[in-house]
């Protein structure tokens, strides 16, 4: 059996955020075409302070061939079965085992506890390697999980919990970026909530027969992108920037019909010979796209310094950084190129710029 999985929709009202309802509607419509009859929503279906779920009920009633299984998340802890009227909605506000071709354990978000503590209360009914965990919170592997801008740790699942209780797979909400780490899968948000959630959005399809995970695109009303350019002074700074801009736009891999949905934030930082020319080129090159909150390209962190000798040194330093041998240093512990170059330029130019 194939089951669709999403999370972190953060519905408000159709009036305030129609794009979020449209994204969920697109998922439900896609399931009919794919022949999938179950959708799991792993928490934060609703945004905080939303207590009337009637518009969601109406949407589900329009797609009554799909059974929707959902748990509360940290933003919608009041989700419970009695709040829904649609016949095809199942809300689990306490740990619940559900047979969907195999055993799924739905663990609703609970403040002040861990997923492992909840799993421990159900372990006698869970056959190792034969059950799937659905939860909402942080998967803790000794480092902070990227993709959440919320402080603290929310209902953590530890690697030791997986080793101890042996779920076959884990499907989690809370992190808005799609990611996979071993058997732990985050679908990510199906519609970007703000400029920090960039690119195309997807939902997951989980195959209960073989644990295969695949992604399926969501046709969203908006597509957020952020582009940041590290500028190093030189006679070729404009030609380099133009080439870099073209490559960035190409990397979005959007077709013509999607370009009008882009909401973009652009910034340039570092040092240059001609700040106005950089600003003009950014504005011209991205002129066909709508900018987030109608903001112009941000060049406030771009300084001018025409010292050719320092520019030559900066170019050489960049080459060394690009060829740096990190050895056995884990990827997640490595500083990014721009982060290193920012520090290097401050040393080279000593803050000397205008």
Question: What is each of the regions a protein language model found here?
Answer:
Residues 1, 25-33, 120-123, 142, ...:
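A structural signal for the main folded, soluble domain(s) of proteins
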Residues 1-58, 127-129, 334-354:
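N-terminal active-site segment of His-dependent metallophosphoesterases
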Residues 2, 35-36, 129, 166, ...:
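Short loop/turn motifs at secondary-structure junctions
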Residues 23-35, 119-124, 238-255:
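A short, well-ordered alpha-helical element
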Residues 38, 47-185, 189-194, 205-207:
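His/Asp/Glu-rich metal-coordinating catalytic cores
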Residues 173-241:
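A conserved active-site cap/scaffold subdomain adjacent to cofactor or substrate pockets
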Residues 210-354:
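Accessory, non-catalytic peripheral segments of nucleic-acid enzymes
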């Amino acid at each position: 059996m194939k089951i669709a999985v999403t999370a972190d929709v953060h519905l408000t009202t159709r009036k305030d955020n129609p794009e979020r309802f449209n994204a969920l509607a697109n998922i439900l419509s896609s399931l009919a075409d794919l022949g999938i009859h179950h959708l799991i929503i792993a928490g934060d279906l609703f945004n905080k302070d939303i207590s009337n779920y009637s518009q969601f009920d109406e949407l589900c009633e329009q797609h009554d061939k799909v059974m929707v299984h959902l748990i509360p998340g940290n933003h919608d802890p009041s989700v419970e079965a009695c709040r829904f009227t649609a016949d095809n909605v199942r809300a689990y506000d306490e740990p619940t085992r559900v047979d969907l071709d195999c055993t799924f354990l739905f663990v609703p978000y609970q403040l002040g506890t861990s997923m492992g503590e909840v799993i421990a209360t159900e372990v006698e009914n869970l056959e190792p390697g034969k059950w799937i965990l659905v939860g909402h919170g942080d998967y803790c592997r000794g480092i902070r999980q990227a993709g959440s801008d919320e402080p603290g740790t929310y209902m953590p699942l530890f690697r030791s919990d997986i080793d101890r209780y042996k779920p076959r797979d884990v499907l989690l909400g809370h992190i808005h970026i799609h990611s996979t780490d071993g058997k732990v899968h985050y679908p990510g948000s199906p519609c970007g909530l703000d400029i920090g959630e960039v690119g195309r959005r997807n939902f997951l399809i989980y195959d209960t027969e073989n644990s295969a995970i695949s992604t399926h695109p969501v046709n969203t009303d908006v597509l957020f992108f952020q582009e940041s350019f590290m500028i190093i002074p030189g006679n070729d700074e404009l030609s380099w920037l133009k080439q870099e801009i073209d490559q960035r736009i190409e990397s979005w891999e959007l077709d013509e019909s999607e370009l009008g949905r882009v909401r973009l934030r652009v910034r340039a930082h570092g040092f240059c010979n001609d700040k106005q020319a950089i600003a003009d080129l950014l504005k011209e090159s991205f002129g066909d796209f709508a900018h987030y909150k109608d903001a112009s390209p941000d060049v406030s962190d771009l300084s001018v310094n025409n010292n050719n000798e320092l520019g030559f040194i900066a170019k050489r330093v960049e080459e060394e950084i690009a060829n740096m041998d990190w050895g056995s240093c884990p990827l997640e512990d490595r500083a990014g190129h721009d982060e290193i170059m920012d520090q290097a330029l401050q040393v080279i130019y000593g803050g000397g710029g205008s």
